[in-house]
Amino acid sequence: MGQLSSLTSVWMVVVVTSWVIIAANIDTVEARSCSECHSNATCMEDGMVTTCSCLVGFTGSGFECVDLDECAIPGAHNCSEGSSCMNTLGSYLCTCPDGFRLTPGLGCIDVDECSEPGLSRCHALATCINNKGNYSCVCPAGYRGDGQHCECSPGSCGPGLDCVPVGDALVCADPCQEHRILDEYWRSTEYGAGYTCDVGLNGWYRFTGPGGVRLAETCVPVLHCNTAAPMWLNGTHPTRDQGIVNRTACAHWRGHCCLWDASIQVKACAGGYYVYNLTETPECYLAYCTDPTSVLGTCEECSVEEDCKSHDGMWSCQCKQDFNVTDLFLLDRLECRPNDIKVSLSKCQLKSLGFEKVFMYLRDSQCSGFNERGDRDWVSVVTPARDGPCGTVMVRNETHATYSNTLYLADEIVIRDRNIKINFECSYPLDMKVSLETSLQPIVSSLNISVGGTGMFTVRMALFQTPDYTQPYQGSSVTLTTEAFLYVGTMLDGGDLSRFALLMTNCYATPSSNATDPLKYFIIQDRCPRTTDSTIQVVENGESPQGRFSVQMFRFAGNYDLVYLHCEVYLCDIINEKCKPTCSGTRFRSGGIIDQSRVLNLGPITRKNVQAVVSRAASSSLGFLKVCLPLLLSATLTLMFQ
């Protein structure tokens, strides 16, 4: 052994069954010790001989090993026609173009973005058309747009509806619900002269306030309504069954009650009010005028506790006289709603007890009562279903969170001898949402998602300690071992919970805060859990407004000390889409792009005693795969979440 080493070249033939036969020049080098072998080589000791051989996917002497580009060698890879070969260190990947999915035995097949939830970006009203490698969106008849954004056009809506602006889009809606308010007191026909001109008006409006709640139906004298030439409705107001009607608004000037005119539309709404589709006045100074007598209301709004009675020639709703209420605790209506608690008292029943005026407030007097009309004339007060606001107190046990407060009732601002207290409480069974709200500092991430034609929704993701998802981690950090399980919950907060299900499309971990980091460990991919990790359990996904999964704690192999969690979510329309994933067999990457605007982020997860963990791992394992795997050794992890 006078030389450093001796080189022996051996020609070998490697047969890959059913695929290719390739020849490779594998070099074996005799060495003095295994320390001389390259990091991408194996060392074999056979008696007195120590040899170094490059790993599969590498070529060289054993002292030096370089990556073998399988993509550049004909027959060295098994990527099918239509797919692309991408060389990696020691191996290669077969990838498909966007819009295709790699399937064993079939190669790259087209992905039907229209049938799989979360893949298309079509507007809620648009029709999705699948094409080879892509898809297209087409707005419905009467709508305009590129399919991802659809807007109605005038005259395209059904009876009683109109094309109105909602947010930054035009949609078919009921103008009784979608309108703007004109509440100027000077619009009253009893107000004097002025120089107001209604320029810039365009769309549906409702008149409110002390000036009147509907347009005047008779010719208004000039120099009234704070303008020179008052505008009035030349015709009668419609009834509710007539829907939207066309009318003419006239302007009075120089002895002509209709010297100028403008075409408008009117609709009668439930509740006894009207909405008007107005245009700006044809000249200045002209303004729309309201009838001041209409502010007194009509008997169309009377509740079951009221009669329509005349007083000084004016008809109005007045409380019936047959009330005989002695127990105030029978008056309250308590509503335990998801986000708040509402207590309502009947004004007519309070009046029968002698309360001509009602001053109502909670423990925190800033939370005071307000009037509202529904099936009755109510005075109500609302407190958030949280500990603290309005003086609300929360008590929690193993199964429920109970919120309590006290309602104070007086008939004068200055209380002398009549002060009534009503204690009330609401109990909520503990679930993910209630548990988060009852925790002091839950570890949670949230994001707002916009749904076309529906509005903004808030989705939250939180970390829980137990499999019943009722005990969230609190504070800024938490300590776990890799033997422990982490329970992750996502939930839709508010919005139309009856229409949408929350679908977790991709949930994964990265070693950096960058959610687009190419090194990802998928927990859920393409809506289905990773089948090669037996610690992953998806409890709920695409079935309700919440999602839940659990996974055993892990770290990334290599020089990574941090782990971040990310979850891409999608609001699935349960009426028009199939939301619950169907998961069976081996799952393959679809090559779809993750929409970062729909990703929730939590992290980082920081390991303690890094050096000790690394040394133990090196002594107990001959090889460490360069992929993200759960740790086999027990180690302490500290989670510090932004």
UniProtKB/Swiss-Prot annotation:
GO terms for molecular function: calcium ion binding. Residues 455-465 are annotated as: Internal hydrophobic patch (IHP). N-glycosylated. Proteolytically cleaved at a conserved C-terminal proteolytic cleavage site to generate the secreted form found in urine. This cleavage is catalyzed by HPN. Disulfide bonds join 34-43, 37-52, 54-65, 71-85, 79-94, 96-108, 114-128, 122-137, 139-150, 152-163, 157-172, 176-269, 197-284, 219-257, 225-289, 250-258, 299-308, 302-317, 319-348, 336-426, 367-390, 507-567, 528-583, 572-579. Glycans are attached at residues 40, 78, 134, 234, 246, 277, 324, 397, 448, 514. Residues 1-26 form the signal peptide. Residues 174-293 are annotated as: D10C. It is a lipid-anchor; GPI-anchor. It is found in: Apical cell membrane; Basolateral cell membrane; Cell projection, Cilium membrane. Gene3D superfamilies: Laminin, Zona pellucida, ZP-C domain, Zona pellucida, ZP-N domain. Residues 152-173 are annotated as: Beta hairpin. One of its GO terms (cellular component) is membrane. Transmembrane segments: none annotated. Residues 455-590 are annotated as: ZP-C. Residues 621-642 form a propeptide. Keywords: Cell membrane, Cell projection, Disulfide bond, EGF-like domain, Glycoprotein, GPI-anchor, Immunity, Innate immunity, Lipoprotein, Membrane, Repeat, Secreted, Signal. Detected in kidney and pancreas. It holds the Pfam family Zona_pellucida. Residues 335-430 are annotated as: ZP-N. It comes from the Eukaryota. The record marks 588-589 as: Cleavage. Residues 431-454 are annotated as: Flexible ZP-N/ZP-C linker. The ZP domain mediates polymerization, leading to the formation of long filaments. The core of the filament consists of interlocked ZP domains which assemble into a helical structure. Each ZP domain consists of an N-terminal (ZP-N) and C-terminal (ZP-C) region connected by a flexible linker; the linker allows the ZP domain to wrap around the ZP-C subdomain of the preceding subunit. The heavily glycosylated N-terminal part of the protein (containing several EGF-like domains) forms branches which protrude from the core and are involved in pathogen capture. This is Uromodulin. It comes from Canis lupus familiaris (Dog). The gene is UMOD.
